[in-house]
Amino acid sequence: MTVLEVLQSTAAYFKKRGIENPRLNAEHLLANALGRTRMELYLEFERTLDETELAPLRDLVRRRGEGEPLQHLLGTVEFCGHVFLCDNRALVPRPETEQLVEIVESKIENRKSTILDVGTGSGVIALSLAQKFPEARIFAVDVSEDALALAGENAIRLGLTGHVQFRKGDLLENLDERFDLIVANLPYIATRDRHTLSREVLHDPGVALFAGPRGDELVGELIEQSRTRLRPGGMLVLEIGLGQSEALLSALAEKNYRDICSKNDYSGVTRFLFARYG
């Protein structure tokens, strides 16, 4: 089979299996199997592939057809212009979180700020901020040792070892520092909504997805705890789930935060909350 024929048959299979963007998935996997870029594939459409080239692709295609995330199969994900390692130790970063980082960057006035990323996962938020603000003191915390190991590998990959201090802990436990900014993309899915999730999402660790019966429990607890860890006038920035904004905005007001506001993601969903304390 030629490169083009393999792409066409793989895309057709993915479409039958209900995979979104089947042709794009096929291109990524074939490029990965051949050690090429997607653009290089277009220059080789008529080249015939031998069995040694097809063998590794078959396993990737099978796993993708069963719902394993493309990012896990490739082992990497692009986020905010950088390539991060990605596997089942942490949540696959979402486009909404790239928007969160862009918003946070626009709100940092002091390049030497002390910043905390809560629920860092693979480290994409903390490390993206470290790239942008090399003079900042950046901390990142997660309850999962596996996620922290992946974040550490990403720090090495990006040449940022030592630029982010990774800590193991549940929310703000084991942290004595005070921060100018706390940012968090915590689990915000209700356990009762598990059946609504795609096969791809269910490959992410449960600890990175589910927060409790309502879904906003962890964010609510962070709102409470952050009052003792923010410097006067410090900012809390949160990514939240669908339909959670009203209750969480009320929680911020009840806990005496000020300058409280929200922002929609690119899909028009209220996804981000901002507030200052003190």
Language model features with spans:
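Conserved beta-strand positions that form and line the central face of beta-propeller blades
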Residues: 40, 208, 262
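Non-catalytic accessory regions of SAM-dependent methyltransferases
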Residues: 1-36, 40-42, 46-49
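Conserved AdoMet
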Residues: 30-103
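Mobile active-site "lid"/loop adjacent to the S-adenosyl-L-methionine
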Residues: 188-218
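Conserved Class I SAM-dependent methyltransferase catalytic core
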Residues: 213-276
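Conserved SAM/SAH cofactor-binding pocket of Class I
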Residues: 92-198, 221
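Conserved beta-strand segments of alpha/beta enzyme cores
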Residues: 83, 137, 163-165, 258-261
